[in-house]
């Protein structure tokens, strides 16, 4: 497994909509394994393919140590391909979020408290999942990436511009 390079804002790829995975191959699964290794390396809770420069509708998630629900031992990591959000709670919950593609930024985001998704798993099998609390938040955050939306898009234009300037400065100091 390889650690993949992270795409950070203001890279334009992060604003593009990802395309569905049409074929499940060993290469697809190897890529998902590489995404997972990369997410762990970055201490992330989730990662979307676009965050490693691939515009495909693939998410990996592992919040095993922070999940409020007791789940089977083999539940995590989650490999979520071509997800669709099929239900959303009306109740919104605001919480602080971070993002691997927005280093050193924390932003308050209001999201539905629970969701239900339909997706393909690691083996291409169709599944449905009801998620609430932190898992629902992480899925929605990563799903936003597939739609070309970042957590800073929930901010006012002024606040978003301030964050983008900070990120540009940070990127220039690293390179």
Curated annotation (Swiss-Prot):
NCBIfam families: pept_deformyl, PRK00150.1-3. Fe cation binds at residues 99, 141, 145. This is Peptide deformylase 1. The active site is at residue 142. Belongs to the polypeptide deformylase family. It comes from Rickettsia conorii (strain ATCC VR-613 / Malish 7). It is an enzyme of class 3 (hydrolase). Keywords: Hydrolase, Iron, Metal-binding, Protein biosynthesis. Binds 1 Fe(2+) ion. It catalyses: N-terminal N-formyl-L-methionyl-[peptide] + H2O = N-terminal L-methionyl-[peptide] + formate. It comes from the Bacteria. One of its GO terms (molecular function) is metal ion binding. Signal peptide: none annotated. Removes the formyl group from the N-terminal Met of newly synthesized proteins. Requires at least a dipeptide for an efficient rate of reaction. N-terminal L-methionine is a prerequisite for activity but the enzyme has broad specificity at other positions. The lineage of its organism: Bacteria, Pseudomonadati, Pseudomonadota, Alphaproteobacteria, Rickettsiales. InterPro entries: Peptide_deformylase, Peptide_deformylase_sf. HAMAP family: Pep_deformylase. Its cofactor is Fe(2+).
